[in-house]
A protein has these predicted regions:
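Juxtamembrane helix-loop transition sites at the ends of transmembrane segments
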Residues: 30, 36-39, 122, 165, ...
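Glycine-rich phosphate-binding loops that contact phosphosugars or nucleotide phosphates
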Residues: 89-209, 213-223
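A short, charged, Gly/Pro-tolerant segment at domain boundaries
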Residues: 224-243
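A short, basic/flexible loop-to-alpha-helix module at the beginning of a structural domain
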Residues: 82-89
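HTH-adjacent hinge/linker in prokaryotic transcriptional regulators
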Residues: 1-82
Length: 243
């Protein structure tokens, strides 16, 4: 067993201010080394070529179901209760909550926006035809947080958004596929889940599960404090039959 003080002394000997900076440097170096391989694998056209022969030789329903189940298991195996509780506390304790997603991840962001709006005040999405995420985060502070959802091929805009939030001292809750994700170096709390697929697109079923599970932890944390808000929403939506 190595003591915490020994680890800190070692990282400072290497020229880092502490273990966290050392950890970020290791993640960044690993990511840069792996990206050339990851990029080749995640290009949709190349993934399609690799997957066609496998799909031809197997039952598509059974194969895809098995793949989704493996991804769901990855959420449970990689993240424990403490990870979800910490992420929930960071979100609930922040003044403003910004949701950062792009492209295919936007479907997760839309659902997350809906659920968090019902649970907490001051929840904002950062995608808008007239504004980009940088415009939305230009006045973010250390009292705020972002919830970023990013998977291969990681969006450069998502990366810049997390960097911007980090520079402002804001908390960053990241849902991604692995701890070596380019955005992970800036994250306060990471939740990892696999999006592996046997075809050309990422599978987001397990990501949706992870997001819903996170919202369940937030709901439990908030308790009955959201009851009045939910009743108010239902009161007016009932008038137009929108549920």
């Amino acid at each position: 067993h190595v003591s915490d003080s020994s680890v800190i002394r070692f990282t400072r000997t290497l020229g880092y201010s502490g273990f966290m900076e050392f950890q970020r440097a290791i993640r960044k170096a690993y990511t840069e080394r792996m990206n050339s391989v990851s990029d080749n694998i995640t290009i949709p056209s190349e993934r399609l070529k690799l997957s066609i022969s496998k799909l031809d030789q197997s039952d598509i329903v059974e194969s895809y179901f098995s793949n989704v189940m493996q991804n769901l298991n990855s959420c449970i195996n990689r993240n424990d209760t403490i990870d979800f509780e910490r992420a929930a506390s960071l979100i609930a304790g922040s003044k403003r909550k910004f949701i950062v997603t792009s492209r295919a991840n936007s479907c997760i962001g839309d659902m997350l926006l809906l659920l968090l709006k019902h649970l907490l005040p001051d929840v904002y999405e950062t995608s808008h035809p007239a504004l980009n995420v940088i415009d939305h985060l230009c006045d973010i502070t250390e009292n705020d947080c972002i919830v970023a959802v990013s998977f291969p091929r990681y969006s450069e805009m998502d990366f810049l958004a997390t960097q911007m939030a980090y520079d402002a001292g804001a908390k960053i809750i990241l849902i991604t596929d692995k701890a070596s994700s380019p955005l992970a170096q800036y994250a306060t709390q990471i939740l990892t889940v696999s999006v592996d697929s046997n075809t050309f697109f990422n599978s987001y079923v397990a990501v949706l599960f992870t997001m819903e599970l996170l919202c369940s932890f937030i709901s439990k944390k908030m308790g009955y404090s959201t009851e009045a808000k939910l009743e108010l929403i239902d009161k007016y939506l009932s008038k137009v039959g929108l549920f």
